[in-house]
């Protein structure tokens, strides 16, 4: 007879018949101190079968409980009564032994260790262990029986049976519960309780499901699916969450038809922008359906879904342009400027950096620089550039310095013309407009040249052990790319830089021995700058970092060493022990800002490796662990997060000088300059930004581990952190509104947007405690963006329209419009406050914001112009309008009456007014009323080409879309409707964002392009015939989203949901 013997001497033993979980969960206790197994007749019946007075088969769970879909429990009736009568002296030397069949057990145990858990930061339930049962499908959104018999070995998928481990745990839980129910807990009973709790804790720690590996090749629960997908099947939960928005349902057959991964690789595992992905939009849709009391979806809901979908048409088109910019920078720039034929050379500048062909392009771009403007701000003329053009390394360094000087001058220019109050230059003056155009023109030319020479330097050998100048150039370039929001190019250059700095040993102290200290400090600074950029990108994209912190042992920069931190490990372990001191306050603002940012990223990186990508919390085997095991992991996550937050708060205290400056109303009292005030404010935004990110990332881990019924403590913690995000958001609003220029508000939006998106994803919960003043501040931030008129006033100029700064501004403005709209709608619905009342309140108390609410809520207003104008599609979306027009697709989804109604309305132009708002709300800009679509004299643009796209017999589900298709550029379909009036655009033809055909080869199916072009030459009837005959030649994602009017008036959101998201979000 074997058993588990803890160190305190209490030993639990059972009889030889513990194979049955029912047998092992019922005990009778004699006065001798031994706990004996009761008669088999009693132990065969579970509690529910006893109540129903039906026969129980004694299995766990029993067949009757599975049929009734109820929890199967075996309580101790006789044993419980007898334990209460035990004399406390009779427990002396008590031994209770639990049989272990380690040879046949399905649970593999690592080396047993005694529980050494210290006091948790998160208070755990007092009856944690005894409150959980292990029966059936206890976790997941769709809990319930799968209707299979217990004897079915496939019920647990490829995981080995763990009934004996369940029996052991159930026995310990039952005994623990009975001991705690005793009227008087003496010393010996308390000791027994502690012993059993130790055994339970040890068992839960060592619970590791085993996989029947040999059967993976022969058995398939989901045909044609990956092994990872097969391992989702288990007996504990029907729904397996990988993120908050991505869930796999073992009962959802629709998922079997998809060949795409559940996790969208574009958004990664932990990106907060998952909310705006198709999965996130579907989750938002589901939440709205569950919370809305309307039988039909109001127009505002349809409009919101449309603009959220449309947002990615713009974003992914910009991503495609970034891919082209770094691959063929010179050709791409010259074509946009109409200086080259429309068909580019097949020779890439990256592939032949020193050819006469490439150098001739370099000369063309240099001669296209606006002079003497560039010489005035950089001090370098075209002739100087032409004389150095054959020296790649030298030319690369010169161009980087020019781009940096251009950046600083451009920022000062925009800060001056957007200063608040209105003492700025007149943005309509000819001189100001010409200067702005020159900045845009010069910036695009310089970045094209930098990309070209960066590609050239990849082919040069550099001995980095003696000369780190080129490494410094790469990090310099990364800083500029980050400022330009060139994310695609930034990622490519970063990969090269991290490879170089790692290869030459900058992260290891061993490579510094024997070096001159000044040279060694340069190397350290290079490493930590590369660390800064890499960790920032990993956090932004939600991917695991390429830098392993455990292998970093070089010293920290001088500022860290001056305050007592030698290396990364020293900092992580002791940061919370160091208080604010003169050593911090004596740092200059820029040094303290860099210290704070690098400190934050080290904490964030440590949290990522210890939780987000820790195998303990993300193992695929966790899907087949009982709820009590996963709940224990949940509390460990909360404990680690609380420890991380304590260290994070220490950084806030150490950098308190920056917080004091950022929140000060009068910076002159602190004797700081305008630049220092802006730097301090941006650090506070950076700090709050990463705190919100960590909370959001933790939410995804919680979704993975969460059981069906969340513990009250977990719910309380989630509410606390939601309030903290709300507090961060309100603080960020104050800082943004305190900037003295609108340009700084716009440039800080990257940090502000994270808190916005997290709050919007929890809009219905947050709206319950949001205040009217918060609504007003949010609208003020939107107004600050709206006041930056220089971009929209000059977008008809090709240099402005093609500039990266224009694209970045339009994305930020469109995104802010969307989140402001959602927050307003959620606030109005949750607070039962009519938005007209809020609008009236603002008119009376904040007259400078008059008309802004109407502007945001009216999708016909100029606020949505960048989203609603026809653009080249990314291929990310599907044409809902064509879905509804296609009879072959409609008939399976809609009833006969619905089909008749659709046919009746197909020829009508439906255009209902927006409830309680005037359609076509005018834009009020500083009191000047401008037409709704012709914004500042500019008509709505026409589509890029008048292509007709094919109609398809059916629309694929979301996960039948391939990622390569999602980012493919395509041409927009001509659309009609109020929001897309087909008027000849004032925009130059070369400003229509056309991407050369040969450049699209890696991203696009050329057959599809040829088919589209051929179809373009036929009349409408011929087009339809060709489309019907050759539909297989087109990608199923070659749809355009259509116009807003078509979507709102003809769209059926239930049909849309059933097609796009029914296989992503199982029905609750």
UniProtKB/Swiss-Prot annotation:
Protein name as annotated: Transcription factor PDR1
Phosphoserine modification, residue list: 21, 930, 942, 948
Domain note: The 9aaTAD motif (residues 1054 to 1062) is a transactivation domain present in a large number of yeast and animal transcription factors.
One GO BP annotation of this record: cellular response to xenobiotic stimulus
Species of the source: Saccharomyces cerevisiae (strain ATCC 204508 / S288c) (Baker's yeast)
TM annotation in the entry: none
Record key words, sorted: Activator, DNA-binding, Metal-binding, Nucleus, Phosphoprotein, Transcription, Transcription regulation, Zinc
Database matches in InterPro entries: AtrR-like, Transcription_factor_dom_fun, Zn2-C6_fun-type_DNA-bd_sf, Zn2Cys6_DnaBD
SUPFAM superfamilies: Zn2/Cys6 DNA-binding domain
Keyword match Heme: no
Misc. comment: Present with 1300 molecules/cell in log phase SD medium.
Pfam families per the UniProt record, alphabetical: Fungal_trans, Zn_clus
Motif (9aaTAD): 1054-1062
Subcellular localization, as worded in the UniProt entry: Nucleus
Task performed by this protein: Positive regulator of proteins involved in permeability. PDR1 and PDR3 jointly control the transcription level of both SNQ2 and PDR5.
Biased composition (Polar residues): 17-31, 104-114
Gene3D superfamilies assigned: Zn(2)-C6 fungal-type DNA-binding domain
SMART domains: Fungal_trans, GAL4
């Amino acid at each position: 007879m074997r058993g588990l013997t803890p160190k305190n001497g209490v030993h639990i033993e059972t009889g030889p018949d513990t194979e049955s979980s029912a047998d092992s969960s019922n005990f009778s206790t004699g006065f001798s101190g031994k706990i004996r197994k009761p008669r088999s007749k009693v132990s065969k019946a579970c509690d529910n079968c006893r109540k129903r007075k039906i026969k129980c088969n004694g299995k766990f769970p029993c067949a009757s409980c599975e049929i009734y879909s109820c929890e199967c429990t075996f309580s101790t009736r006789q044993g419980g009564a007898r334990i209460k009568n035990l004399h406390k002296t009779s427990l002396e030397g008590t031994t209770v032994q639990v049989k272990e069949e380690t040879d046949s057990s399905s649970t593999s145990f690592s080396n047993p260790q005694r529980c050494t858990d210290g006091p948790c930061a998160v208070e755990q339930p007092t009856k944690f262990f005894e409150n959980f049962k292990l029966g059936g499908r206890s976790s997941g959104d769709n809990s319930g029986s799968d209707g299979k018999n217990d004897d079915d070995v496939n019920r647990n998928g490829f995981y080995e049976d763990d009934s004996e481990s369940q029996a052991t745990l159930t026995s310990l839980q039952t005994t623990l519960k009975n001991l705690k129910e005793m009227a008087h807990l003496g010393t010996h009973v308390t000791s027994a309780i502690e012993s059993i709790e130790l055994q339970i804790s040890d068992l839960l720690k060592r619970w590791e499901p085993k996989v029947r590996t040999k059967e993976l090749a022969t058995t398939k629960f989901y045909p044609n699916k990956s092994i990872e997908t097969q391992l989702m099947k288990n007996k504990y939960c029907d729904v397996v969450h990988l993120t908050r928005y991505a869930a796999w349902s073992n009962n959802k057959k629709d998922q079997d038809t998809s060949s795409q991964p559940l996790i969208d690789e574009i958004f990664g595992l932990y990106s907060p922008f998952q909310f705006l992905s198709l999965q996130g939009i579907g989750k938002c849709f589901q939440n709205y359906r569950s919370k809305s009391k309307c039988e039909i979806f109001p127009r505002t809901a349809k409009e919101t879904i449309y603009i959220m979908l449309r947002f990615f048409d713009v974003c992914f088109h910009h991503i495609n342009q970034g891919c082209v910019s770094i691959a063929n920078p010179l050709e791409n720039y010259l074509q946009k400027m109409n200086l080259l034929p429309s068909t580019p050379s097949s020779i890439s500048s990256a592939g032949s950096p020193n050819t006469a062909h490439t150098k001739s392009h370099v000369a063309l771009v240099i001669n296209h620089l606006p002079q003497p403007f560039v010489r005035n701000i950089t001090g370098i003329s075209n002739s100087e550039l032409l004389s150095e053009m054959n020296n790649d390394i030298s030319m690369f360094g010169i161009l980087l310095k020019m781009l940096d000087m251009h950046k600083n001058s451009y920022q000062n220019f925009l800060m001056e013309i957007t200063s608040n109050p209105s003492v700025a230059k007149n943005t309509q003056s000819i001189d100001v407009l010409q200067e702005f155009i020159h900045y845009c023109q010069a910036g695009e030319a310089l970045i094209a040249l930098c990309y070209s020479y960066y590609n050239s330097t990849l082919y040069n050998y550099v001995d980095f052990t003696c000369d780190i100048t080129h490494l410094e150039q790469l990090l310099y370039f990364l800083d500029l790319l980050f400022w330009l929001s060139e994310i695609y190019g930034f990622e490519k250059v970063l990969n090269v830089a991290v490879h170089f700095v790692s290869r030459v040993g900058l992260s290891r102290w061993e490579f510094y021995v024997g070096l001159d200290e000044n040279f060694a400090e340069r190397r350290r600074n290079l490493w930590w700058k590369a660390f800064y950029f890499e960790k920032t990108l990993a956090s932004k994209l939600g991917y695991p970092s390429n830098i392993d912190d455990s292998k970093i042992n070089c010293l920290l920069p001088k500022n860290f060493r001056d305050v007592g931190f030698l290396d990364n490990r020293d900092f992580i372990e002791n940061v919370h022990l160091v208080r604010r001191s003169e050593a911090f306050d004596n740092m200059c603002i820029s040094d303290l800002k860099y210290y704070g940012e690098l400190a934050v990223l080290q904490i964030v990186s440590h949290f990522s490796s210890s939780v987000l990508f820790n195998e303990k919390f993300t193992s695929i085997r966790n899907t087949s662990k009982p709820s009590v095991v996963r709940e224990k992991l949940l509390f460990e996550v909360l404990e680690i997060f609380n420890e991380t937050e304590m260290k994070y708060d220490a950084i806030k205290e150490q950098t308190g000088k920056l917080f004091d400056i950022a929140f000060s109303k009068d910076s002159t009292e602190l004797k700081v300059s305008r630049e220092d005030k802006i730097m301090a404010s941006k650090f506070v935004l950076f700090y709050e930004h990463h705190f919100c990110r960590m909370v959001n990332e933790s939410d995804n881990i919680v979704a993975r581990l969460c059981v069906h019924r969340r513990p009250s403590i977990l719910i309380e913690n989630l509410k606390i952190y939601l309030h903290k995000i709300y507090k961060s958001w309100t603080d960020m609003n104050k800082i943004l509104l305190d900037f003295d220029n609108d340009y700084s508000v716009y440039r800080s939006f990257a940090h502000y947007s994270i808190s916005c998106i997290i709050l919007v994803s929890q809009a219905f919960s947050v709206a319950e405690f949001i205040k009217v003043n918060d609504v007003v501040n949010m609208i003020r931030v939107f107004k600050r963006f709206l006041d930056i008129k220089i971009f929209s006033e000059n977008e008809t100029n090709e240099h402005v329209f093609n500039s990266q700064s224009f694209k970045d501004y339009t994305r930020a403005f469109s995104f802010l419009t969307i989140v402001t709209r959602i927050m307003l709608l959620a606030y109005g619905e949750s607070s039962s406050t009519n938005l007209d009342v809020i609008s009236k309140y603002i008119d009376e108390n904040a007259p400078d914001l008059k008309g802004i609410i109407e502007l945001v809520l009216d999708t016909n207003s100029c606020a949505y112009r960048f989203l609603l104008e026809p653009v080249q599609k990314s291929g990310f979306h599907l044409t809902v309008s064509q879905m509804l027009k296609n009879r072959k697709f409609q008939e399976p989804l809609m009833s006969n009456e619905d089909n008749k109604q659709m046919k009746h309305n197909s020829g009508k132009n439906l255009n209902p007014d927006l409830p309680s708002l005037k359609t076509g709300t005018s834009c009020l800009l500083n009191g000047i009323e401008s037409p709704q679509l012709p914004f500042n004299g500019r008509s709505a643009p026409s589509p890029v080409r008048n292509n007709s796209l094919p109609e398809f017999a059916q629309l694929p589900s979301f996960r039948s879309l391939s990622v390569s298709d999602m980012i493919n550029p395509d041409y927009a379909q001509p659309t009609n409707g109020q929001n897309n009036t087909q008027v000849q655009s004032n925009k130059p033809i070369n400003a229509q964002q056309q991407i050369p055909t040969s450049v699209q080869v890696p991203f696009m199916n050329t057959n599809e392009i040829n088919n589209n072009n051929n179809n373009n030459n036929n009349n409408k009837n011929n087009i339809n015939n060709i489309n019907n005959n050759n539909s297989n030649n087109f990608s199923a994602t070659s749809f355009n989203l259509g116009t807003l009017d078509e979507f709102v008036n003809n769209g059926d959101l239930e049909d849309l949901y059933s097609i796009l998201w029914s296989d992503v979000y199982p029905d609750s």
